[in-house]
Every structure is written in C-alpha cells, then in structure tokens.
C-alpha cells in the first residue's frame, strides 16, 4: 500500500512518481497498490481516472471513504469512475465514509446503515471482479482509525466508540456479508 503523489502536484509530476513506483515494482517483484486518499493524487474520482487512463498497470488500494468525503456524496453520480477503480483494486481498506467525513462515527449505528451498505456494494464488486479475473487472493483490512478519524467527545477527547470493537464488528460484518 502506497500513499503516492500529491493532490497539489501537476499531472506530469504525479505521472513521473507513479512511473518510478512501477519501475521499482518490476525491479523488486513487489506489487504496489496506490491508495485512494485525500491529499494524494487519487483523492477524487476524476483525478484517479486520469491516472488509470495513463497507467494501464496501475493497481489501487480501494478506500472509497475518502471519495465520499471529497465528493460529498455516496458516489451515486460517480458510477463509471467507481467501476474503473473497482476494476483496478487489489486491496481494500474497509472504512466507511460519508458525505461529510472519511469515517462514520460508528458503523453499527442505524443512521449510518446507508453508508455501510453502499461501501459493502463496492467491496462486493471488487470481490466479484477479482474472482472473475482468476485472482486467487484479495486482501481487506478493517481500517477504522483513532482520533482525528474517530469522533471524540468535546472537552474530554474521549472517543465516542471503542475502536477495537468497531474494527472487530467490521471484520465480522465482512465475513458474514461478503460472498467470496
């Protein structure tokens, strides 16, 4: 997993970085997946699609939570770009984002069910595409993080949910709901 490039670099600068990463990948025999992440060139659907067009061998770490935050939607209007990213995804960061933040406070809460189900659909598509391509593996990491990703109570800094329990829930949710 690599946090490659920056959102503030020109496309040519980012392409040079990705081409170097690709050369290292080939030289060392270590696969590299470039994470979809805010602050990186993969921060948005359109910027990522530009890279996918220019770099036919580019692999992604799918973290749609960042795109939800950046685009302020559950990506209903980004279907083609989401499918393009799914087709290149080799690793999944299973964090659930929403229109205003890259991490829901607690995916077990009913008010976050639409966001959880949207992410599950994307993750299932990744599983399906990987299987159809003959891939024997797909790695998935529940990736709910501590503050500042995790919302805290004002004045105390205490997290509003138990991070360990949230990630355990995600592991169990993925095990129960993904059809592999």
State where each predicted segment sits.
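Histidine-acidic metal/acid-base catalytic patches
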Residues: 49, 54-59, 68-180
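Active-site glycine-centered loops adjacent to acidic/histidine catalytic or metal-binding residues
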Residues: 63
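Active-site acidic/histidine proton-transfer and metal-coordination neighborhood
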Residues: 1-60, 165
């Amino acid at each position: 997993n690599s946090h490659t490039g920056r959102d503030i670099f020109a496309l040519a600068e980012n392409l040079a970085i990705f081409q170097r990463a690709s050369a290292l990948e080939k030289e060392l025999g270590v696969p590299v997946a470039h994470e979809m992440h805010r602050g990186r060139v993969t921060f948005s659907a359109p910027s990522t699609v530009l890279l996918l067009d220019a770099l036919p061998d580019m692999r992604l770490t799918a973290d749609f939570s960042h795109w939800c935050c950046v685009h302020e939607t559950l990506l209903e209007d980004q279907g083609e770009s989401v499918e393009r990213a799914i087709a290149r995804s080799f690793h999944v960061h299973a964090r659930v984002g929403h229109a205003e933040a890259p991490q829901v406070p607690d995916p077990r809460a009913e008010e976050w069910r639409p966001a959880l189900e949207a992410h599950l659909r994307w993750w299932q598509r990744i599983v399906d595409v990987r299987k159809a391509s003959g891939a024997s593996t797909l790695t998935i990491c529940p990736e709910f993080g501590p503050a500042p990703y995790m919302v805290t109570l004002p004045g105390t800094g205490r997290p509003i949910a138990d991070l360990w329990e949230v990630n355990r829930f995600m592991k169990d949710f993925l095990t129960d709901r993904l059809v592999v």
